């Protein structure tokens, strides 16, 4: 029981104790039955003039309150109840354990709150009245072993309580001295066979002057603190002063048994989540749930204002703000020098001991704990019991799965302080922080580069060693490191390297060539056409309009799909750039497509240069070199007119075309060694060198001859068949001397090579001076012998389809085999048989002649050596 200290003071309702009730000692003999309870309580009512026996039964708690008696001083106190069962249990424990029984106001309050007083509202009293002390005697039948040496509390003059042991006679005398005179007169004799127990109860008298409101008002306050969650405090006021006066003027207990006591109705609603908060109406319950239960309780750190959902998380976080760590937090292992926490050190020390009871049956490794052996056994069994729900990847350890699941998270909570990059895991951030280190301890022994990790150095060393361990699964390309292989697989083939699925929204390499889309290109083409039409005079406009009308009539008869028109467009700008031709600023190429055959006599295909407005300046980025365009795109020929139709001048006059100057490109010095390059790299190098040499004028384009076929400079089917037939019939030996043709050292002649090896290109064939001591008989028309480059001779096919080597009809070649010649220097491999199945680059570019006229007609063919060594 406790009393309020003032009118403004409010009393918090304590939460019910979660501890289990103490065990009742003494068994059935020491604990009174229900009938004994009723007899004791009825005796108390007759002797001490108590109020009544409460016959309330709280259904919410399922506790029968009929065994509880309301104790009051002068019948003025109402609202505090005490269970007789709990009272006898306390007495049994104190008697058998011989311990101190502390029945002060605080302990009484806790005991009452833990048992049955949680549903009974507390009372508020005024501080104008001082508390009065009175004594109550509880009677119970005397057990077989009477209580002896029961401890009680003796109040000193200073206000402190000192536990003492008093005899029953001393207790009786002290009780008579302290009891008021009015109570001594009303006191009745005790029952015989009973034990007297005196309790000191401090209770505050009810107010006399102030009249509280008639209705019970329930007030709820939220007490907030820094570390603890808000708790609801309940305050209730007494109903009215009239009820207190009625309680004082109640009839004696005998009459109260017949007349039931009017009790306040229990609250209709109770919140089970807020320490038993009592609410009257459903509206209050709804408002309370909307205001309180939807709020998220958080705990905020006072140092960094970080919020936590649990108090334990906040306490753990507060340890990080310590200026100095605890001395015993980390310990150093004396055996291996590893630093561990104090709680983990004792388990770590067992690793260095010989007491390892758990041994693996497969490899014989021993472990200290059984769980370590279980984890080790999964290595041999390849068991992975933990599966990722996102990607179905399995792991052997739970910690590995938890670390993997962070990669699926969309949030990147780890930020680099130097560059601001965000990462999903702390491990990724630590790896990234190595980039910002000034020290790069891993240096390459071949070049002067250094790296932050050994793995980066190993990837770099593959460049020097030539190792390309990462090979593409879809093409013959290989790479020195994994990032380049991954980028090639995803962008070039658009395939996921893990699952093999096709990727849709992955940019390809071609997207880097141009940043403009098709709509922008179409708009630019329309603007160019409009500018060109405005520059033409009115006569030309009328002529062009007539041509357009005729074209519309023919198009209605045989409409052509739009996709075919797109295919006819040729990248002329890229073709000119590949050939090294630069156009003046502000010019563009406009291609006029040929008209149908019925109108070919009126107009022919023309190319017009149209001035354009200067484009907006753009930042040029360094792009890596691409493969050159195909030969068909390099040299486009207009379609030949049908025989019998005379070529007529076009109706539209051709404007003057400005001179296009060819800028010579500096050629590389000595040719690179092609032995160390792959086939793809060698072909690219040969293509570039061949184009550069043609642009510089080192090779003269031969006269066009379409005897072999009517196609363009690309090799035809018959030429390809002839090419492979020659390869099969030529022996693997060195070519005889009469199969070579000399040339002047100042003239570089085209080389229609028939060999398809990477070394067969004219850019890579460079045969130097060949000395000879033999006598050569030359005709009168033959030129003197000069040392220079030598190539394959002309050839013809006989009637049986066999290859026969022939010389020019004007020339006569004789060779003396008396002396053996010698070669001074050859800096390229010999022309031998190759296993490659496709024609070489130079064959595609420069082979367009057949028969004997394909080699230097009008020159004498002479040879100097029968063999090359």
UniProtKB/Swiss-Prot annotation:
Name where it's found.
Nucleus
Please give a single GO biological process term from the UniProt record: regulation of transcription by RNA polymerase II
Q: Where are the zinc fingers (C2H2-type)?
A: 269-293, 299-321, 331-352, 358-380, 386-408, 414-436, 442-464, 470-493
Q: What is its main location?
A: nucleus
The Low complexity compositionally biased stretches are 630-648
Extract one GO cellular component term from the record: nucleus
Q: Which UniProt keywords apply?
A: Developmental protein, DNA-binding, Metal-binding, Nucleus, Repeat, Transcription, Transcription regulation, Zinc, Zinc-finger
Q: Which GO terms describe its molecular function?
A: DNA binding; DNA-binding transcription factor activity; RNA polymerase II cis-regulatory region sequence-specific DNA binding; zinc ion binding
> What does the record give as the function of this protein?
May belong to a complex set of multifingered proteins which play an important role in gene activation or regulation at early embryonic stages through a maximal accumulation of their transcripts (or protein product) in the mature oocyte.
What is the name of this protein?
A: Serendipity locus protein H-1
